[in-house]
Amino acid sequence: MKKNYLITTGGSGGHVIPATILYDHLEKKANVIISTDKRGLKYLNKDIFTLEIINTPKLNNILFLPLTFLSILFLTFRSILLLKRKKIKKLISTGGYMSLPLIFAAKIFSLYIYLIEPNQVLGRANKFFLNSCKYIFCYS
């Protein structure tokens, strides 16, 4: 039986393109789903990839911060349902704020979390979850 993997990505091509390459590699031996936000959709073909949309709001507007935290809480609950429904065993994140709800949900289920850092400097989301991950993959 194939394992179920979820790759969470979104935002810019710098996050999404590595996720698509990993998807192509893993789909030969596992069931793979990509979760992205609306911005990441422009880099993904719905006919090629199995997709789930988790549209996490940006964390950059201090006036809407309480609403943003409520939204992330709601999306974490939605992510819990997704992980359970799809029987996900491992979560791979390319970082970014859009990965927050899914990684929180994966922590609740004690799933293996793998982080990919596509930049030379560790991003804030990956730094936040560094102690929760099984491995972090970086470019050299």
Task: Please provide the spans of the model-predicted regions.
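An amphipathic, basic-hydrophobic alpha-helix
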Residues: 61-90, 100, 108
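Histidine-centered beta-alpha loop that forms part of the nucleotide-sugar donor binding/catalytic region
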Residues: 10, 96, 117-120
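Active-site-proximal region of nucleotide-activated glycan assembly enzymes
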Residues: 31-33, 39, 107-140
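An aromatic- and histidine-rich active-site surface loop
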Residues: 39-42, 90-109
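Short amphipathic alpha-helix
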Residues: 15-26, 39
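Well-ordered beta-strand positions
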Residues: 50, 90, 134-135
